[in-house]
């Protein structure tokens, strides 16, 4: 599985987080000009033989990370999350300064109880909280000064990554047409 080793995936920030960081940059309306980063391998790895697989693990019924290896691709990716050969960070934090004066904190943790993306944006006109999970459920909550709250539940578009793949292609072609 290429999400286990730096030799195949330099970091999960580059492999997975880049999509969320791109969205964060869009929210912030600027370009990062300074970044401080930290992270580590603090939960997974370091315990089991690198050859151990979910398909023949004696703890399969009790392991929350058990993968049912039904397809050939799944069988290739059913390596134990506790394997000693894992060397990628399982958590990372970024402090980002933007060229427009805004700042952001980005945290990525791969051992949370759920698989979600959550954003909280603060500004002088209120707070926006956004939640997205892997099933394409979206919730956006806007809280204004004084306490009024508005909730939005956008309907995801069809297609890869909740419709964003085709929207990226459209934006790319529009940028070409606009000479950007």
Regions found by a protein language model. Give the residues of each.
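Predominantly a Rossmann-like dinucleotide-binding segment in NAD(P)-dependent oxidoreductases
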Residues: 1-79, 94, 172
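Generic preference for well-ordered secondary structure
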Residues: 7-8, 19, 78-80, 105-106, ...
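Short Gly/Pro-enriched turn/cap motifs at secondary-structure boundaries
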Residues: 12-15, 82-87, 109-110, 161
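Short, flexible, glycine/charge-rich loop motifs used to bind or transfer phosphoryl groups or to couple energy/partner
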Residues: 25-26, 83-84, 94, 110, ...
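Acidic/polar loop patches that form or flank catalytic/metal-binding clefts of enzymes
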Residues: 31-37, 103-106, 127-131
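Short beta-strand segments enriched in hydrophobic/aromatic residues
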Residues: 39, 98, 108-110
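Alpha/beta-hydrolase fold catalytic core
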Residues: 69-106
